[in-house]
Amino acid sequence: MILYPAIDLKDGQAVRLLHGDMDKTTVFNDNPAAQALEFVAAGCEWLHLVDLNGAFAGEPVNAAPVEEILRQCKVPAQLGGGIRDMATIERWLDKGLARVILGTVAVENPDLVREAARAFPGKVAVGIDARNGKVATKGWAEETDVEVTDLAKSFEDAGVAAIIYTDIMRDGAMKGPNIDATAALANAVSIPVIASGGVSSLEDLHALKSCGAALNGAISGRALYDGAIDLAEALAVLKG
């Protein structure tokens, strides 16, 4: 399994939100590129980036810090937030991004996801953000009636590289991930699943690893910044 350290960008800073609420922000680093370099120096092989402002605006907002991270860090990075058309997808991939994460558009314009996955094999992931089993969009501000598993299964034959599954009520809360829902999703689809939201201890990582090969990785943010998870130990758990 791969550990994806999260760098969530708001107003040019690396932050964490509680339950996806933009009014409940903790700033962890004024220099996101420096934070990214710390993660890489510690042995991380991927970076998970989120343009929080972009997720609400529907277009890239924190492009400058993302581009700086891509310039300075020599490991692949995936980015979500505000990527809702082919031009934006192409622009980010041209700038060296390894993978784009399509969330809102996966609900509102699934054909774009399929088109992008065909055009850029291995470079398109679907972000499924859930609250009480239902998909939320537009920076988690809007809830839909779409079931998580139904949305995931609709992309079975689309060629997407991964599904990033986030339980919103666990995100930033340090209460552990939703293991049951994550495992159920991973076992319901053939697409690799990456778990996000609530990873707060080495025990959580052990629990996710026990879900089996269907789970490709885990994203952690606040626990790494707070020191609740030792990064070296976390990497060892997931590689072991």
UniProtKB/Swiss-Prot annotation:
SUPFAM superfamilies: Ribulose-phoshate binding barrel (SSF51366). GO terms for biological process: L-histidine biosynthetic process; L-tryptophan biosynthetic process. It is found in: Cytoplasm. It catalyses: 1-(5-phospho-beta-D-ribosyl)-5-[(5-phospho-beta-D-ribosylamino)methylideneamino]imidazole-4-carboxamide = 5-[(5-phospho-1-deoxy-D-ribulos-1-ylimino)methylamino]-1-(5-phospho-beta-D-ribosyl)imidazole-4-carboxamide. InterPro entries: Aldolase_TIM, His_biosynth, HisA_bact_arch, Isoase_HisA-like, Isoase_HisA-like_bact, RibuloseP-bd_barrel. Pathway: Amino-acid biosynthesis; L-histidine biosynthesis; L-histidine from 5-phospho-alpha-D-ribose 1-diphosphate: step 4/9. Signal peptide: none annotated. Its main location: cytoplasm. It is an enzyme of class 5 (isomerase). Keywords: Amino-acid biosynthesis, Cytoplasm, Histidine biosynthesis, Isomerase. It holds the Pfam family His_biosynth. Belongs to the HisA/HisF family. NCBIfam families: 1-(5-phosphoribosyl)-5-[(5-phosphoribosylamino)methylideneamino]imidazole-4-carboxamide isomerase, PRK13585.1. This is 1-(5-phosphoribosyl)-5-[(5-phosphoribosylamino)methylideneamino] imidazole-4-carboxamide isomerase 2. It comes from Ruegeria sp. (strain TM1040) (Silicibacter sp.).
